[in-house]
Amino acid sequence: MKRFGPYLIFAAAMLWATDAPFRVHLTKDLSSNFIVLVEHFFDVLIVLPILLMNLKVFKALSLKQWGAVLFIAIGGSALASVAFTQAFHYVNPSVAILLQKLQPLIAIGLAATFLKENFNSKFWLWTILALFGAYLISFAGFKAQLFPGETLNPNLMGVGLALIAAFFWGGSTVMGRYMLSSVNFKVMTSLRFTLAFVFLLFMNLYQKSIPQLSTVTKTDWLFLLIVAITSGVVSLFIYYKGLETTKASVATLAELGFPMAAVIVNWVFIPNSALVWPQIVGMGVLLFAIFSLSRYNQQQAIKASKISLNSN
């Protein structure tokens, strides 16, 4: 299973991008905070049986472990999304997206500090390749392109918010790997959704962003349910199953499946949106890097097992 862990994370990250066509419809009439709240409500309904069957596990968690769970649920699920969205009010989308590409490097740094993960020269080679591939996918012209009507606006507040989002997302990968040494992937998923839902509920009530439910159409409810299942609970089950056997430093690079899938989804669903050759090359480079990182992850696991056996 250690060999397939990075592939599961890559597949989960690609699922995160499938909600784009539905969100385009939903954001026309509903606030982003309310959309995320309802998604988490549906997700909590699905994971509630798991939550109830594992109450003893929750009682056994240490203060440090609860801190990690809260970081993931509040930081990774809520605050990161809010910070990244707010960054667009201060800087151009292209600047925010470019800064978000620092997320893997932040996660690698946290993995080295918090989890004491070690890296060899091969890891850094595949890391550079993966980041280069992701960069080509997002910026096919080899440089960060401004969107129509944009002018360069490197506002310090916007830069800070984008980096905060990258920190929370990168940190959530590391904290998730830490927690999975104590709980299984199903318990981790249920914890994340439940605590995030409670936080989002209070945030929506405070900001008064919950609309009259009568104004939410049947199509809205259907799309919210689809998003909650596909890019929500299903993708996180797959993600945490993969993270159980994957180093956090490898996992954060496997998450680059998200920008690749986002470009493909745009190509399929947005009229006159075409894939250009740098993006196709970037996809090939990224896939090769993920394949190589998967082998690296397996080799590191075998090495760790041998060291453990010898020490015993």
Where in the sequence are the language-model features?
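Membrane-interface helix-cap regions at the ends of transmembrane helices
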Residues: 22-25, 29, 43-62, 132-152, ...
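Glycine-/small-residue-enriched transmembrane alpha-helix faces in small-molecule transporters
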Residues: 1-36, 74, 147-178, 202, ...
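C-terminal transmembrane-helix exit sites in multi-pass transporters
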Residues: 46-54, 103-128, 132, 260-280
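Loop-to-transmembrane-helix transition segments
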Residues: 4-12, 51, 59-83, 156-165, ...
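Transmembrane alpha-helices of multi-pass small-molecule transport proteins
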Residues: 29-79, 106-110, 168-172, 189-208, ...
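Helix-helix packing/entry segments at the starts of transmembrane helices
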Residues: 11-12, 35-38, 77, 81, ...
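Juxtamembrane helix-loop boundary signature in multi-pass membrane transporters
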Residues: 1-10, 105-167, 283-312
